[in-house]
A protein has these predicted regions:
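Hydrophobic alpha-helix immediately C-terminal to the catalytic Tyr-X-X-X-Lys motif of short-chain
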Residues: 26, 30, 34, 65, ...
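Oxidoreductase cofactor-interface core, primarily capturing Rossmann-like NAD(P)-dependent enzymes
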Residues: 38-44, 51-76, 86-87, 91
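Catalytic helix-loop patch of NAD(P)-dependent Rossmann-fold dehydrogenases
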Residues: 2-43, 48-49, 54
Length: 205
């Protein structure tokens, strides 16, 4: 939900706004309630993932901005002051690989945030512009979407000694390369890149 404090940590109160976040929180509570010597639940709360992947999504903030910048030569920013923490897809994978090998007794029942860059949407647009083409136009549009939050991954870094290796700029350039080499085509009209459309097509929603 919307948070005013400078860094949101794992023990802060939760106030989910969307059904998606409400269901995720409910799942956390259910999993943690089953903790025992034979079941070691561990919760990762990732920031928004960005970058190129084989099951590509183009409905996430950095990927949306990069898609528009590369193909339309314009970036539409709705609002702009909202903070959006992100994590590169390669670091997200590394987090999961890391904890598969971690000590279960240490992990059991724990919760960690996973995200390294807390930028405003305006800042994200500027990062994309810098890496795609400085001539790209950024259009700012008013919005009533005031979701804004700034997460801290200090626990992941300090308690578990995890280090992030990839940046938002890396994600933008990975996508740029995928567009350049034809790995991603029809990026505005192919429903497979957009989760809501994909789920609608198979009657999940």
């Amino acid at each position: 939900g919307v948070k005013e404090k400078s860094n949101v940590i794992e023990t802060d109160s939760t106030h989910p706004i969307t059904d998606y976040s409400k269901f995720k929180l409910n799942c956390e509570k259910i999993l943690l309630s089953y903790k025992n010597k034979n079941f070691c639940p561990f919760i990762v709360r990732p920031a928004t993932v960005c970058g190129y992947s084989r099951r590509q999504r183009l409905d996430l903030i950095v990927n949306i901005l990069t898609n528009f910048a590369f193909h339309k030569k314009v970036i539409n920013v709705f609002g702009g002051d909202q903070l959006r923490p992100n994590i590169h897809i390669k670091d997200m994978i590394r987090v999961y690989e890391f904890f598969i090998k971690e000590d279960l007794d240490k992990m059991s029942g724990d919760i960690v945030n996973a995200g390294i860059e807390n930028n405003s949407v305006n800042e994200l647009a500027e990062i994309v512009k810098k890496n795609i083409d400085n001539k790209i136009e950024i259009k700012r549009v008013p919005t009533d979407d005031n979701r804004s939050y700034h997460i801290s991954s200090k626990k992941l870094i300090k308690d578990y000694n995890f280090q992030f290796n990839h940046t938002i700029s890396d994600a933008v350039n990975d996508l740029k390369n995928a567009f350049d080499t034809g790995k991603l085509k029809n990026t505005f009209n192919d429903d497979k890149f957009f989760n809501v459309k994909l789920m609608q097509n198979i009657n999940l929603i």
